[in-house]
């Protein structure tokens, strides 16, 4: 949604390449600590006020100080306007992902900005402006007459927030032009619409708590089963992900044994062959997990059994958990799938695996978040000093390109790491999903970039390019 209303210093084009947006150019100092962006002249916010370097500096310092969203700008020491069209960022330390992150933060006006009310009345410089927003119901937008880029041919666009079943029913009744559907509905027939299946970097997988139960600040953490590397490895190499995709996702998606694929910073050595059932059984047996009379493994009185969480508002994740549970049975591991709302599920993640969705064009977003010992989404509580060292080295590189080979070491450096079948395996990655939409036959949604994770919004990244055929 942010993309609809706001502009960025830089942006991703339809080929996922970083290109100018608000900024016409930028330069980086030799020591990698100063970034200077020169803005295009004459850009205005949707209310007609000029967008200046002061607004850019304000936007970055606000997110740095408030920690809003999931973009990490803690490395910024200062941001200031040198003049109306030049903004300078001083960093405390080098950050190779800084340029990429400047393609992720929308610019807001310094004057009159109020964080509490802003989502109900956003003032941006992007291709659209808000007409009406009813949380959980609908969002109505119209073209921003001040926008400096390609103008939409549509006078007004309405986004409806619907359940999967309701969305499909509305599509079948001819009330929608575009509707995202879960794979379980993708083989339905909808008159006047066609299925569009779009490739992504959007991966699904489960964190596996890496240590035995203990209390931290009075709260329970850890899991007695997934704490055993033998269980984590047996699950990773033993299950058949292709069968899970076929049975749980209608065959739509690509099996994934690692977090990253087909990206310049993805390490091919992190991937491995799965479906090695007998080898996985032997790993469990050798580790002391013996089958009981019910066909479930036990070790020192502990059943090889645990819950696995999906999300009640995203049944795709629950369906994946069901598929994993069916595969785990063959290993003598009892997994019980559960579905909760997101907030409740997050209260359970210190002890219980949850299905995560992720995929980012910023390498640090996923690799620091999931694998860094202080990562914001490292619910596996994975900690490896060598991995942390590689992360620091990658961030300290002068450019993203220089960092790519180091990011590969974060995943697996040949001796240690979270990924590869010989790694620590704090996650059980399952699939890189496809995003599936029914689209009206007379609507052209333009060239789509390979979608990142985004809960249905990535299809609208090029909304101003959509047109009737």
Language-model features: where?
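Ligand/substrate-recognition segments at binding pockets and active sites
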Residues: 289-359, 435
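Aromatic- and charge-enriched surface segment that lines or borders ligand/interaction sites
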Residues: 24-67, 82, 88, 170, ...
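Surface-exposed binding/hinge segments that line
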Residues: 27, 31-38, 71-112
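Alpha-helical secondary-structure segments
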Residues: 52-59, 84-86, 126-127, 155-156, ...
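Ligand-site clamp/hinge motif
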Residues: 144-189, 325, 334-336
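N-terminal lobe/hinge region of extracytoplasmic solute-binding protein
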Residues: 1-30, 61, 123
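Gly/Pro-rich hinge or "lid" segments in bacterial periplasmic/extracellular proteins
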Residues: 13, 101-152, 156, 166, ...
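Detector for C-terminal structural segments
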Residues: 134, 143, 204, 236-268, ...
């Amino acid at each position: 949604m942010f993309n609809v209303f706001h502009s960025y210093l830089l942006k991703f084009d339809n080929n996922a390449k970083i290109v100018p947006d608000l900024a016409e150019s930028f330069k980086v100092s030799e020591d990698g600590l100063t970034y200077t962006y020169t803005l295009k002249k004459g850009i205005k916010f949707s209310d007609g006020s000029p967008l200046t370097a002061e607004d850019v500096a304000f936007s970055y310092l606000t997110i740095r100080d408030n920690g809003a969203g999931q973009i990490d700008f803690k490395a910024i020491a200062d941001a200031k306007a040198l003049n109306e069209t030049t903004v300078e960022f001083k960093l405390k330390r080098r950050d190779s992902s800084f340029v990429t992150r400047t393609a992720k933060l929308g610019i807001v006006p310094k004057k009159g900005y109020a964080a509490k009310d802003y989502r109900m009345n956003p003032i941006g410089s992007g291709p659209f402006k808000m007409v009406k927003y009813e949380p959980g119901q609908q969002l109505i937008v119209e073209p921003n007459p001040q926008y400096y880029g390609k103008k939409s041919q549509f006078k007004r666009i309405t986004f409806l927030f619907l359940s999967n079943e309701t969305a499909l029913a509305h599509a079948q009744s001819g009330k929608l032009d575009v509707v995202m559907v879960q794979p379980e509905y993708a083989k339905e027939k909808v008159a006047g619409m066609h299925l569009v299946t779009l490739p992504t970097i959007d991966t699904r997988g489960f964190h596996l708590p890496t240590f035995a139960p203990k209390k931290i600040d009075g709260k329970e953490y850890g899991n007695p089963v997934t704490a055993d590397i033998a269980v984590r490895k047996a699950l990773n190499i033993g299950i058949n992900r292709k069968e899970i995709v076929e049975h749980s996702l209608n065959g739509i998606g690509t099996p994934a044994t690692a977090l990253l694929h087909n990206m310049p910073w993805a390490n091919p050595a992190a991937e491995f062959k799965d479906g090695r059932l007998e080898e996985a059984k032997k790993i469990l047996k050798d580790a002391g997990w013996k089958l009981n009379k019910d066909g479930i493994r036990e070790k020192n009185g502990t059943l090889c059994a645990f819950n696995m969480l999906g999300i009640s508002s995203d049944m795709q994740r629950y369906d994946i958990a069901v598929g994993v549970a069916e595969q785990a049975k063959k290993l003598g591991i009892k997994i019980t799938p559960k579905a909760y709302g997101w907030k409740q599920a997050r209260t359970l993640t210190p002890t219980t695996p949850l299905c995560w969705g992720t995929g980012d064009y910023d390498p640090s977003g996923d690799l620091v978040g999931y694998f860094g010992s202080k990562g914001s989404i490292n619910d596996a509580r994975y900690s490896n000093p060598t991995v942390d060292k590689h992360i620091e080295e990658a961030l300290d590189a002068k450019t993203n390109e220089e960092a790519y080979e180091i990011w590969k070491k974060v995943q697996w450096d040949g001796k240690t790491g979270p990924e590869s079948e010989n790694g620590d395996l704090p996650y059980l990655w399952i699939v890189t999903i496809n995003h599936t939409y029914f689209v009206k036959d007379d609507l052209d949604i333009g060239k789509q970039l390979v979608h990142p994770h985004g809960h249905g919004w990535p299809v609208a990244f090029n909304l101003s390019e959509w047109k009737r055929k």
